[in-house]
Amino acid sequence: MDNMNHEELNDQLLVRREKLHNLREQGIDPFGKRFERTNATNDLLSLYGEFSKEELEEKEISVSIAGRIMTKRGKGKAGFAHIQDLHGQVQIYVRKDAVGDEEYELFKTADLGDLVGIEGKVFKTNVGELSVKATGFTLLTKSLRPLPDKYHGLKDVEQRYRQRYLDLITSMESRETFVTRSKIIREMRRYLDDNGYLEVETPMMHAIAGGASARPFITHHNALDMELYMRIAIELHLKRLIVGGLEKVYEIGRVFRNEGVSTRHNPEFTMIELYEAYADYKDIMKLTENMVAHIAKQVLGTTTIQYGDYEINLEPEWTRLHMVDAIKEHSGADFWNPMSVEEARELAKEHNVEIKDTMEVGHIINEFFEQKVEDKLIQPTFIYGHPVEISPLAKKNDEDPRFTDRFELFIVAREHANAFTELNDPIDQKERFEAQLKEREQGNDEAHMMDDDYIEALEYGMPPTGGLGIGIDRLVMLLTNAPSIRDVLLFPAMRHKQD
């Protein structure tokens, strides 16, 4: 469609509307009724692809298929077309003497993009292409707009995202990506259900934006006359359920963060969060690597995948590396010995690590990791032992309380999961929230708000608990070799189209 000028496009629109008018004049419904299919295109290939031309002629197999006309050729009393459904394409052969004058005229005047139903016999052409010889041809939906150029598809990447329906029509690869996405989520559910987890649903609108460090979307409830926040995480409601005795829970759902758009970020995205009573972050590490490997095996048939230039091995057990050791390995800076914030700032200056004046030692450690280590983590790696300053909901490590029992999973230099042994001490939790409030006062609008109701829930007693969050969109990117998050979201966030 990029190659057409407006005049050509308008001509095509007019011609198709004239055809629509003619169909109605003839008493033919251009937007037809239910059509019963016996087979999808991939069924035909798997069931009959191995038969010879002669065997198919002898068997006289009758089928009924439906789909969109993608190619069409032929003149006179016979013609060929390719019909596309969700699973692929199959060729049809339409002869005037086989379908009759009226139906052949329908075929002759059909346009690329029209949706049709075909009844006929399976056969092979002289060059061996499995096809359907039509005995009936039904117009199901008249297409009033021409499809993008079949040889070039949608060249404009932005148009692919804005008009995803055209992308799905013209790109088999795109269709396969979204079918795979559905399978990934299905296998994730199956794995957790089979391991005794209970799927639950919790509110998407919260009185307090909690469970993550992020800027929320704010909305207003008219009847209650109160501000609400679209959830930035699922966490705190699920942990209330752990308090209530639901010992293994998970939720797959949308999360909203009022932040930038990039190849890795969309303002609304899909997460899974899960929590298990009487477990810790080490148990959750095992669960994570086993679940991701299971999904890869079931959906892709392998745990060795290609992402960009990298071959990634998802077979457990994955590398486990303390954040401080990772920093020492990749930069030489050693944070194991306790130090003052002035010493940490001097170290940052020495290693050209950019920091803000308000940062404490833990924040500086995290900046070292993000600037010196993160882009080196290609194979699956659990980075654990995050500083307490950046982990307000994680339990302190017993041996070194400067750090927490928390991990993040990195693959191809991207964070794919975040998990901890959950903080279940209500007094410590309140102190952490208060420290976060001070950060908000200093200008960090992503710092956690105080949540007194959650503190009260913890005061009733939450068992030792391991929790996990995985960004499903990024996992789908990894398993489908997609370079951008927009390639795995059916309708990604876009700016208003400029006229």
Swiss-Prot record:
Needed cofactors, names only, are: Mg(2+)
Q: Which InterPro entries match?
A: Aa-tRNA-synt_II, aa-tRNA-synth_II, aa-tRNA-synth_II/BPL/LPL, Lys-tRNA-ligase_II, Lys-tRNA-ligase_II_bac/euk, Lys-tRNA-ligase_II_N, Lys-tRNA-synth_II_C, NA-bd_OB-fold
Keyword ATP-binding annotated: yes
Q: How is the cofactor bound?
A: Binds 3 Mg(2+) ions per subunit.
Keyword tRNA processing appears in the UniProt entry: no
- The residues the entry assigns to the signal sequence are none
Binding-site positions, Mg(2+) 2: E415
Q: Which GO terms describe its biological process?
A: lysyl-tRNA aminoacylation
What PROSITE patterns does the annotation carry? AA_TRNA_LIGASE_II
Principal localisation: cytoplasm
Q: How does it assemble?
A: Homodimer.
Q: Please state which protein family the record places this protein in.
A: Belongs to the class-II aminoacyl-tRNA synthetase family.
Q: What is this protein called?
A: Lysine--tRNA ligase
The scientific name of the source species is Bacillus anthracis
Q: What is the lineage of its organism?
A: Bacteria, Bacillati, Bacillota, Bacilli, Bacillales
